[in-house]
């Protein structure tokens, strides 16, 4: 069994960096899509559903779009600036997702709906990049 484990580890060690890259792209693209889905600005759906001002609703849409873009781009910046950008993206994702869960899905706490929703996995992704930065 150890021999098989070593062979599998050796195989995947050559492509280990792809795991975090796939995760980064998945979370980033999800935020880009969610942000773009709120265009044109101001996003009337957010204004009507949450009774937000046009400025705040537009800020949410732009924030989601930019966070996704920055999360992806920062993964290719291999210095402290890229690391900070990744952490800031993770922080913004975490804040956005906690806010969304509290205001839009408070009835999900703590049910199976919470743990089978896209939102919880986006939150987990945000926390991951906040903690790990570019050291993934």
Please name every model-derived segment:
Residues 3, 40-54:
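Membrane-interface interhelical connector segments
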Residues 1-37, 58-66, 70-136:
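Extended, low-polarity transmembrane helix blocks
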């Amino acid at each position: 069994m150890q021999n098989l484990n070593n062979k599998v580890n050796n195989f995947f060690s050559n492509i280990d960096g792809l795991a975090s890259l796939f995760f980064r792209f998945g979370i980033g693209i999800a935020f880009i899509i969610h942000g773009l889905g709120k265009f044109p600005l101001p996003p009337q759906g957010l204004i009507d559903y949450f009774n937000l001002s046009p400025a705040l609703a537009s800020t949410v849409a732009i924030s989601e779009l930019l966070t996704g873009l920055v999360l992806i781009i920062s993964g290719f910046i291999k210095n402290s600036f890229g690391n900070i950008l990744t952490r800031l993206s993770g922080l913004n994702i975490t804040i956005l997702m906690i806010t969304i869960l509290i205001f839009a899905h408070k009835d999900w706490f703590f049910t199976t709906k919470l743990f089978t929703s896209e939102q919880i996995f986006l939150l987990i992704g945000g926390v991951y990049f906040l903690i790990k930065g570019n050291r993934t």
